[in-house]
């Protein structure tokens, strides 16, 4: 019980220390990533598969990389669990909203109102196996990404310049995204949608490439945010709390 109280206190201090905009973007990206994953992307080859979740999934990893570099992998993982819990709460809200009798604005197509309305309810309400798969996949990828990022930082010769930040971010994001995509594909797409193992692996690899490229594009702004945090001593309360609790 004392351990639980300690963890709750630690997380509460952490949430006060992480800039609110960063945490907000992180949580919003996790929620929208899972919602957009309902739409697949048409690709020219049958063995390739991607969904629209890749539009924002890179933002989740960018936030995790910045938090990991400044606060450490445990803090980034705790923030990830908070994002997951908020996402589960929003999924419950979406599910309840989908069960409320009514008509969606986009369903007003003569002769197809009921079909379109039902499809929109199904998309917003979601299904248990997609939610389960996406939750497990994100938790696994967050842990892999955060601790890989931290480990790469420890072996880097110069851990304060952009080159070092970019190296650890690109590699950890690539590995984390591959784990995310593959875990989701194996749990959901392979079991429920009939994807072959080849499609699962290719989807994971293709998504990893696309999302890592997004990380490359936006990594420099992430690095500048990190420098601003360091300059303004962001997270002082958290660091002092962790130092005191370690004694």
Regions found by a protein language model. Name each.
Residues 87-108, 138-146:
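Transmembrane alpha-helix/helix-exit interface in multi-pass inner-membrane proteins
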Residues 118-137, 141, 154-160, 168, ...:
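Membrane-embedded alpha-helical bundles of multi-pass transporters/translocases
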Residues 2-84, 88-89:
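Hydrophobic transmembrane alpha-helices
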Residues 76-82, 162-169:
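Membrane-interface alpha-helices at helix entry/exit sites of multi-pass transporters
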Residues 97-127:
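Membrane-interface interhelical connector segments
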């Amino acid at each position: 019980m004392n351990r639980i109280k300690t963890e709750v206190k630690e997380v509460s201090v952490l949430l006060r220390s992480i800039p609110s905009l960063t945490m907000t973007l992180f949580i919003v990206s996790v929620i929208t990533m899972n919602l957009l994953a309902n739409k697949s992307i048409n690709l020219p080859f049958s063995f390739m598969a991607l969904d629209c979740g890749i539009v924002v999934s890179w933002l989740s990893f960018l936030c995790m990389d910045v938090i990991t570099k400044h606060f450490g992998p445990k803090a980034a993982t705790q923030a990830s669990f908070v994002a997951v819990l908020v996402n589960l709460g929003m999924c419950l809200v979406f599910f309840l909203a989908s069960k409320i009798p009514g008509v969606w604005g986009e369903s007003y197509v003569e002769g197809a109102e009921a079909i379109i309305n039902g499809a929109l309810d199904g998309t917003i309400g979601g299904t248990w196996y997609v939610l389960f798969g996406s939750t497990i996949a994100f938790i696994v990828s967050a842990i892999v990404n955060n601790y890989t990022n931290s480990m790469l930082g420890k072996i880097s010769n110069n851990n304060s310049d952009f080159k070092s930040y970019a190296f650890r971010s690109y590699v950890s994001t690539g590995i984390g995204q591959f784990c995310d995509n593959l875990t989701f594909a194996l749990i959901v797409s392979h079991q429920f949608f009939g994807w072959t193992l080849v499609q699962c692996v290719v989807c994971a690899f293709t998504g990893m490439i696309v999302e890592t490229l997004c990380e490359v594009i936006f990594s420099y702004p992430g690095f500048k945010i990190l420098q601003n945090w360091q300059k303004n001593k962001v997270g002082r309360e958290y660091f002092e709390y962790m130092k005191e609790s370690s004694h």
